[in-house]
């Protein structure tokens, strides 16, 4: 059965209580990949995937998910600052729909506004050269996106347990 592509909170209802999540920062040339621990506390980088074809990209992402026994995916959705969705967001949604046809793992969409800007500032602060930043920025953006989603899910879990 194909997976669902949903906003993060709705997708979380489809995920088991435990299990790693795979975070993705989708670019036109690369895909940054991060993964969480099974308790969903910490995101760590996995790789920056050089995009080839959708079939090849999806096969690699599904292999990573399988290797990590992932419970689902978190895909950064590039929403404009005014809240609208432009061509990049539409392309991301299309990628998510196509990936969902190949897996039963629910895909959660998470607002990634300013993630690359924040990561670039952090890497500049670490005095990393432009060439080195270019090699790691997408993977670090995937970490940033996934960690933001994990933090939001943790707040929701604490809130629901308190009620």
Swiss-Prot record:
Enzyme Commission number(s) of this protein: 3.1.-.-
An annotated GO BP: rRNA 5'-end processing
Coiled-coil regions listed: none
Locations listed in the record: Cytoplasm
InterPro entries: RNaseH-like_sf, YqgF, YqgF/RNaseH-like_dom, YqgF/RNaseH-like_dom_sf
Entry-linked Pfam families: RuvX
GO MF annotation list: nuclease activity
Cited SMART domains: YqgFc (SM00732)
Gene Ontology CC terms: cytosol
Signal peptide range in chain numbering: none
Keyword entries, A-Z: Cytoplasm, Hydrolase, Nuclease, Ribosome biogenesis
Family: Belongs to the YqgF nuclease family.
Function: Could be a nuclease involved in processing of the 5'-end of pre-16S rRNA.
Name used for this protein in its record: Putative pre-16S rRNA nuclease
Protein's organism: Nitrobacter hamburgensis (strain DSM 10229 / NCIMB 13809 / X14)
